[in-house]
Amino acid sequence: MADAHQSPLLLLPLKTTEEVDLGSAVKSLITNSYGEDSKKYSEQTSQLNRARQDAVKGAASDATGRDLLFKWFHMLEMLELRFPELRVPFPWKDAFTQKTISQSSLAYEKASIIFNIAATLSSLASSQPRMPGNADGLKRAYAALRQAAGMLSYINENFLHAPSTDMSKDVVKCLVGITLAQASEVFLEKTIEEKKGAGLISKLASQTAAAYTGLVDDSRENVTKGIFERSWAYLIQVKARHFTSVMQYYKALADDAAGSHGACLVRLTVAETAAKEARNLLTTFSASATASVTADRPSLPSDAASALVAIVNAQVARCTERKESAVKDNDLIYHDILPSESSLPAVDKLVAANPIPIQEIFAAPEVQRVIGPDLFQNLVPLGVHEKASLYSEEKAKIARAESERHDLATGEMQASLDYLGLPSSLQKYRALAQGSGSNAMLDSLADPGPEVMRWSTEEAEGGGGRGADGLGVGATGVDSALQRIESIKSQAANDIDAALAALDDENRECEKQRVRFGHKWSQDPAGLHTKDMRVNLKENKEAMQQASQNDAQIGGLWKSIRQDVQLLVSGREALEAAFAAALTGQTGLYGEGSAPTSLIDTSAEEESASEGEIASVRAKLAQIDEALIKLNKIKKERGEVLADLKEKIQTDDISQVLVLNRRAQNVDSSIFAAELEKFKPHQNRIAVSLHHQQALLAEVETAFKELIELPASKAAGAKWDEKEQARNKLVARLKRARDSNAQVRAGVAKGLQFYADLQEIVKATRQNVNRYVGERKSERSKLVSELEWEEKGSDGLSSSMAGLSGLGGAGGHPAPPTPHRHTSYASAYGGAGAPGPLSPGPPPAALPGVRQTSNSGPPPPPPLPHQQASYQQQPPPAAAAPAHDPYSSMFSSGPFSAALQQPASPQHQRPPTHYGSQLGYACDAPQRAPALPPPPQQFQPSFAPSVASPTQSRYTSPPPVPQGQQTFSGSSGYGMPPAPLQHGGGYGGSQPYAAHDYSSPPPQSPYGVPIGQQQYGGGHAQNQPQYQAYGAPPQQHASQQVYGSRAQPPPPQQQQYQQPSYAQHGGYQGGYQPPY
């Protein structure tokens, strides 16, 4: 019970004896009783004496001593069987009183050896290590104590008049109780070490406490009589109180777990009290244990006193600590009422230790290996064994012969009755024999029968699975499920089509802007990012198409059985009506219009049958029924006789007879014949049954042939066969409906799950597509605004410079600087190139020394997507002196003029949603763009990327995104998509393209030119683009050379948007075995 100590166990004392010469007595018996030369058994008799000496003198109380005692007991058993008249004095000292008692009986020697075996087993159990973590020691101690109890119980049951005190009935009974109590204690230790439930532990502790408590009075009495040592009684008292405390403690834990906090507190109080009582008894035990430990034959382990003190003190501390905690919890939290101790229910007992019978002990393989062969097996002559084997073969021949006769007769009877169709074929004639008319017999065919009604009950409860599929009962549930499947399938198809359409629109809008801005358009082609999304959408669509084929198969199967399934769930009345309709040959499943009183319309000739014909049918039926009853009775009796014969043959043993007659010559045959006569009555009864069976079968065959030849029987039989065939067809149809319905329900249930999973996947994919499109649209809107601003600023600067040259440099405003761009496209992919969204900034100030002719500044840049106002809503302020404003020409022509003349698109009025990067990801319709012009003849980009161009700067590592803008932190773009329904990440995410691996092949642009590998011509005159076929490499002209002033930046690794297809989710794979 404690971590550092194990509970001490009592050791039973050993009986001692003196040397006995068994060899001489056995030799004398061999010579006198068996008529053999005893010198041939000198070695065996020497081994016999040596075995006794080893068992009772030389061995210690360990496993070796136990095995030697087992071996010697087995020899005693064999001696008693062969030499029951053996008489040798066996002196033994009483284990407790040390008084010597001698008896000339093998039974006394056997009882003494059994007692010593029990004592040795108790010593083995006490010496086993039972510390925590040593499960094998616990098992060995538990088994040894149960075996000791079994040995002692055998003494009480078989040796009624014990000559010594140690083997008296009361003392042995007390010793059995002690060993079983200790076995229960060891099992409790194992249960506590394995951390079983508190309720189970309390039951085992209750049994252990009860066992020790019941031994208190007996141990005191034996101490008073001077049989037991005083330490035994004190140890039993201490353990009785200790395990009572353990029982109450674990029951308190169980009550606390069950919410009975008041009962828990009371039980903890009782447990603490019992533990303290055990502690108070330790003083007397410690004083008496010293004598038991230091004796010549100690009955307690050397550390018994210290170990028990530690265990009891630990229990006291455990109870006190838990009680204080329980009091505090109840006072502060539970406020539960404390019941009285007497009102607490008693703890149930669980018996965990029973004695192991001695027969089971010696039957164990390990014991059989120890005891070895019989020393005197040669005393039974081999010829006797051979004769016994011959006799056994004769018995086996009789058993085989009678079994064959029985099986042959039973098979012959069954074959004859099957050939005649009996007794089922008599049913068609019984109604006629009862005088109800030739058609009344057919009414029984309208009964659906137990099998069909069982099918009906199953279907009414929701099929063979009793509604476990959740589809409901009958056809309504399946119809509703099929409708749900179609609805979900339609929604999923719409989602897939919508997602593909959104990707197509996004790609089209991107390419429009690419055509519009040419080499300045730096947004990646959509194909770089949408390949995996398109593949996933395609795979899901193909999976849905495959599932639709299975849906069609299930629908067809369901259509063919729906009406029959509905009939099965309609109840008995509908089934009877259907069977009646089938018998009358009516169309319609439920037999509408059928006459309720008659199943078949027959002519007057068929209805009329003379009373004499009916009487003849009745007589033949009675004759056949009586013969069939007799046949069944004969079959049953014959089987019983055969079983009794086999049992007698199995238990018959004439070994003793053969041994007694082993000296007689040529008497084997007569002995065998006389012994085999005991089986003759059984053989005769089987033969008579065979004869009676043959006669009855002939009688049945004759009577049945006469029955079917009667005129009335012929007419009734013909009608019956016709209608029975119709009934069987209906039954087969209902069986098919029942079996197919199980397949349909299973397929529909799996189909619902499949489409539900598919819908979730498609929904997640569509959400990701929408997010991607919104991000791309937001990025495209920013790029368009910036490029338009560059164009307008460039055009305005040219006009202003022209105006300034007309003024002669005397005054006027300087050319406006190029609007500062706050992002190098790293921000468009998740970087933080600027602290906020792209802003045009304040208008530039007038250059020094230039005359100000107007109060108006340069025009503001175009609005960003998240700004509501257009240029018409925020026009530039009116100029004070427009004739002298050098910037006025910027708004009279060029792209700014066109931008101001166009009203803002209504699609741009909704403010976009902002995600993790600096972009405003608008999820509305694509931005208005000019129509895609017809493809030119050649497309060869020739611009040289500058330091500030997006091509040069977008793939560098951007600065980190400000903390306030990281709403999708940790996202990784489209390379690693989130799981369905777990949204996150933006177009660029917080991990920009700078960390990409560029070892993969360069991606292709939608027009066939690899991104990052365009070839540039030598002049601006050759900058007209030329369309190539999709996937075709661009044409290389001799006059063109690869741009070499600055190496092209490596292309970004294509990030894959890996939305798993439904097939990767373990979903539908096609096939119809079973559906879905």
From Swiss-Prot:
Localisation per UniProt entry: Cytoplasm; Endosome
Coarse class of the protein's main subcellular location: cytoplasm
Entry keyword set: Coiled coil, Cytoplasm, Endosome, Protein transport, Transport
InterPro entries on file: ALIX_V_dom (IPR025304), BRO1_dom (IPR004328), BRO1_sf (IPR038499)
Coiled coil: 489-550
Comp. bias regions, Basic and acidic residues: 775-794
Biased composition annotated in UniProt, kind: Low complexity: 795-804, 1021-1036
A single cellular component GO annotation: endosome
Family, as annotated: Belongs to the BRO1 family.
Function recorded in the entry: Involved in concentration and sorting of cargo proteins of the multivesicular body (MVB) for incorporation into intralumenal vesicles.
Protein name: Vacuolar protein-sorting protein BRO1
Name of the encoding gene: BRO1
